[in-house]
A protein has these predicted regions:
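Hydrophobic anchor at the beta1->P-loop junction of P-loop NTPases
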Residues: 90
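A glycine- and Lys/Arg-enriched "phosphate-lid" helix/loop adjacent to the NTP-binding pocket
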Residues: 177-219
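Domain-level signature for soluble enzymes in the chorismate/prephenate branch of the shikimate pathway
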Residues: 1-86
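Walker A/P-loop
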Residues: 99
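Short, well-ordered alpha-helix to beta-strand connector turns
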Residues: 155, 178-179, 223-224
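P-loop (Walker A) phosphate-binding loop of NTP-binding proteins
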Residues: 93
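ATP-dependent small-molecule kinase phosphotransfer cores
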Residues: 115-173
């Protein structure tokens, strides 16, 4: 082996170790992202990022600026990994088109779709109407919150939420902390003509829809 081959062999060894460590680092970044989503913490922490880069490179005697550039690139990729796991939540009244919009949007941006009502129906083996009629709204809301936690932890989905998911206070920081919230504010005249199947709280017709809209509109707006 000549001198050049020796240099290259050493670089190969270092690169192999770097690849292993990068994989480990990015896996940990995913776990940190999950923790942030579940605890409502922001992905961005610019001050800490500056401190991290400075601390990792301050003792270098050569190529410090190159190392700074590499660390900044690694941090950018780590944040991208975490952002890719953010959900896109669609919220709004029953009949506002959340499920249909979620499916279309998921296809457009190539992300999987999650529909909290459908997940509940599949798990319980009952329609939403049957769950309400058999077990009551409080039971449904508890199951809905559990379902939301699972969706938030998995991340990376376009999520069609149930119309009343934001009426449970503990759900709000989970949704806001684990993704982007979009309010589908459909015209009230369209909502009045929405189908009532699996929408037990609007089975009362026009008055029920108007009452529900008045009760929820500000919460939808504040969360989006």
């Amino acid at each position: 082996m000549n001198e050049l081959d020796g240099f290259r062999a050493e670089i190969d060894r270092i690169d192999t170790e770097l690849a292993r460590l990068l994989e480990l680092r990015f896996d940990l970044c995913e776990e940190i992202g999950r923790y942030k989503r579940m605890n409502g913490l922001p992905i961005e922490n610019c001050e800490r990022e500056k401190e991290l880069v400075a601390a990792r490179t301050e003792g270098m005697l050569s190529h410090q600026s190159d190392a700074v550039a590499v660390f900044r690139m690694i941090i950018r990729r780590a944040k991208r990994i975490q952002k890719e796991k953010l959900n896109l939540y669609l919220v709004g009244m029953p009949g506002s088109g959340k499920s249909r919009t979620a499916r279309r949007l998921a296809r457009a941006i190539e992300k999987p779709v999650a529909d909290t009502d459908k997940l509940i129906i599949d798990k319980q083996g009952m329609s939403i109407d049957e769950i309400f009629d058999t077990h009551g709204e409080a039971f449904f809301r508890e199951i809905e919150s559990e379902t939301l936690l699972g969706v938030a932890e998995r991340g990376g989905h376009v999520v069609a939420t149930g119309g009343g998911i934001l009426t449970v206070e503990r759900n709000i920081p989970i949704i806001k902390g684990s993704g982007i919230v979009v309010f589908l504010n459909r015209d009230i005249s369209i909502l009045l003509n929405a189908k009532t199947a699996n929408r037990p709280l609007i089975r009362g017709g026009r008055e029920a829809v108007l009452k529900l809209y008045a009760e929820r509109i500000e919460t939808y707006r504040k969360c989006a």
